[in-house]
């Protein structure tokens, strides 16, 4: 994979050295009369991993400069790498082979220096999340972690010295639907009281205040949302054990329906005939 720099003058990319990695064979049996084995380097438990590194090269050509990320490259994964907007720096996430420690580096593509700004740990296992959005003119960013026992979104300063909880509460954030820096909110799905029901909540990105429930309280069940980029509108889906899925376009601020897209009326009639209890 590769990433263009914000100014389009450089490319940061991964290089994978698969020497010594065992071969796994996939079978291609779809485009000819006879199947063909396709060799693919693929490590198994306890065997050698690929050695992966991240480098930077000018878009005009020339030599690649490599980041000297600490640690054995065959026992660590450079799982994520992205340019920080409007800068010559990249953020690199380094996951150990046990996948319970995520070390976050900021690398300067001019000097090739590295700074560890954050290390997230778990006794068992860490998921890699793609919920990073830069805020406050790249002075801070959002970060997903289970550090307090719940899956929550945090606001972290660029130097990693400050970390503030955004989605405060005794619940897991099931899904991040929209991070809206302009409006100052993050919208997410959670089930604080009943795991069979999912609702949309929002919390302030500055970490102040309590979580606000966006979904109507009088509609118990499963809610899902596809939110517009400006967080003003959404495609809202609702269903429960006795209500077939109902889909509509809504004003997200008021949750007022703008247009009904699908109400599954025929199915709702058939379900009503069954006389199921609520």
Question: Which residues does each predicted region cover?
Answer:
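Short coil/turn segments that connect the beta-strands within blades of beta-propeller domains
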Residues: 7-9, 86-88, 137-139, 182-184, ...
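Non-catalytic accessory segments flanking enzyme active sites
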Residues: 12-16, 21-24, 50-53, 67, ...
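Loop/turn-rich, solvent-exposed surfaces of beta-rich toroidal or solenoidal domains
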Residues: 135-154, 180-182
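Hydrophobic or amphipathic alpha-helical targeting/insertion segments
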Residues: 1-13
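Beta-propeller blade signature
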Residues: 52-59, 105-112, 155-159, 201-206, ...
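A short helix->beta-strand "capping" segment at the edge of beta-propeller domains
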Residues: 59-70
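Short, conserved, GDST-rich strand-edge loop motifs in beta-rich repeat architectures
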Residues: 1, 16-48, 95-97, 189-192
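Surface-exposed acidic, glycine/proline-enriched linker/cap segments
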Residues: 1-2, 30-51, 56, 126-140, ...
